[in-house]
Regions:
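Conserved beta-propeller blade signature
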Residues: 57-61, 108-110, 163-166, 209-212, ...
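Residue-level detector of Asp-centered blade-edge/turn motifs that repeat once per structural unit
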Residues: 52-55, 102-106, 158-161, 204-207, ...
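Beta-strand-rich domains and repeat architectures in extracellular enzymes and scaffolds
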Residues: 34-66
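Short loop/turn segments that connect beta-strands within beta-propeller blades
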Residues: 74-78, 134-138, 178-182, 235-239, ...
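Short, solvent-exposed loop/turn segments at conserved positions within beta-propeller repeat blades
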Residues: 63-67, 118-127, 169-170, 220-227, ...
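Surface-exposed loop and turn segments in beta-propeller and other repeat-based domains
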Residues: 12-39, 84-92, 142-150, 188-194, ...
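Repeated scaffold domains used in trafficking and secretory/extracellular systems
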Residues: 43-50, 92-101, 149-156, 194-203, ...
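Blade-level signature of beta-propeller repeat domains, shared across WD40, Kelch, NHL, RCC1
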Residues: 373-407
Length: 407
């Protein structure tokens, strides 16, 4: 399959952006970006999206230099409603990166803030905030700064145990935050001076284990091992870590469960343009099916699954032709949806457990504007299986939110 039956752009801001290749990339400092009116106000990304079954709306966390970070999108009216995050942001809170979590018990959202500033401003920046948003009362509560000076790349929650876990950035560590006591603690470092792991997002399984990836240290050696990026899991009871020697599969691995789905014509791997030029099984996304499997997407574009009962990892297929696979979500009926891609070659995939194939959809273009997402960073799905695609890092214009219905 190659086409969606319907894709539509939903435009929050619509700035045309100029000079990325000619003036900015590899040259500017962050302060210059902030000082430029068009880039400060127009260079937004939809970094995270979450469907709320209570009100049928989609909540959108942005990358926005001006600190305007949280919006509600109402599908029925196709309206964006700003949630006035600038009530609490400071100049260094410029992203809700991953993830925007909805707690069904208290009906609040939980998220962390991330950064764009350079290293010379780290002493001015207080660190990433953990925030709770009560949408019924329209009230924000800054729960704390789990790791001062560092910012929050992603979070996962075990609301039953009153825990939020997160990965920090740019120095990579795993923290645990106790919601009742509002206390944060660093549990482990996950990256190091030798290697950048950037696990993107962790998940908590049904038994309370937190899953993520880490980079080996090898301070005693000059050479990486064959598996420098590996899986770990952590349980708060007994504060137990299991550091595995295996990681996620690579695109070149030949053993896989399913055939590769069709790919867009002319879409070659763009891995060399990412921070991860080599395919070491870097984790780009994780989604738990609520039962047994954690699905994971790799930066190189492979889909795999982790069996939480045996800790085994299986490669399913190569699904993103260009690489980058940051979007994964599981619908209420168990259908897995994924999204990713680079350089305009973006894709959506669908897998129904038990099927012998993965469906692939590309040519994601809204005919009304003759344009499509440059990249997709995350996706959400509603009860009618409409998809919400979060575009990010478009350097020609403001990024948009996109809706898609698959045949």
């Amino acid at each position: 399959m190659t086409h969606t039956t319907e894709i539509k752009a939903h435009i929050l801001r619509d700035y045309r952006l100029a000079g990325w290749q000619e003036r900015i990339v590899g040259r500017w400092h962050y302060r210059q970006l902030v000082a430029d009116d068009d880039w400060r106000n127009g260079w937004i990304s939809f970094d995270t999206v979450t469907y709320n079954p209570d009100d049928g709306a989609v909540y959108c966390g942005l990358n926005s230099i001006d600190g305007d970070l949280l919006y509600r999108f109402e599908p029925a009216t196709e309206r964006f409603i700003g949630l006035n995050s600038r009530r609490w942001t400071d100049p260094f809170d410029v992203k809700i990166h991953r993830t925007l979590l909805h707690n069904r018990s208290d009906r609040c959202f939980y998220f962390g803030t991330s950064l764009l500033h350079d290293i010379d401003q780290q002493r001015e920046a207080p660190g990433g905030k953990l925030v709770r948003y009560d949408l019924t009362a329209d009230r924000y509560d800054v729960l704390g700064v789990p790791v001062p000076m560092l910012y929050i790349q992603s979070i996962a929650a075990d609301f039953a145990r009153g825990k939020i876990y997160g990965f920090t950035y740019p120095a990579e560590a795993l923290f645990e935050f106790d919601l009742a006591g509002r206390r944060g603690e660093v549990l482990a470092y996950t990256g190091n001076a030798m290697f950048f792991s950037q696990p993107h997002n962790p998940v908590v399984d049904g038994a309370g284990w937190l899953w993520g990836t880490y980079a080996e240290t090898r301070a005693w050696d000059e050479k990486l091992s064959d598996v420098p990026i590996r899986l770990f899991k952590y349980h708060p009871e007994g504060r137990r870590f299991v550091w595995f020697d295996h990681g996620l599969p690579r695109k070149a691995d030949r053993r896989q469960l399913l055939p590769d789905p069709p790919a867009p014509a002319g879409a070659a791997s763009a891995l060399a343009e990412t921070r991860h030029r080599d395919d070491f099984g870097f984790c780009d996304s994780m989604a738990y099916d609520g039962k047994r499997y954690i699905y994971a997407g790799t930066v190189a574009g492979a889909l795999c699954r982790i069996d939480t009962q045996t800790d085994a990892v299986e490669k399913m297929a190569n699904v993103m032709a260009t690489g980058r696979f940051p979007g994964l979500t599981v619908a209420e009926d168990g259908t897995l949806y994924g999204a990713g891609g680079m350089k305009g070659h973006t894709q959506v995939i669908r897998y129904r457990p038990g099927d012998e194939r993965i469906d692939s959809f590309f040519d994601l273009v809204d005919p009304a504007i003759n344009d499509g997402p440059a990249r997709i960073h995350e996706l959400a799905v509603d009860r009618d299986h409409q998809l919400y695609l979060a575009e990010n890092d478009n350097h020609q214009r403001s990024s948009y939110l996109w809706t898609a219905r698959l045949p």
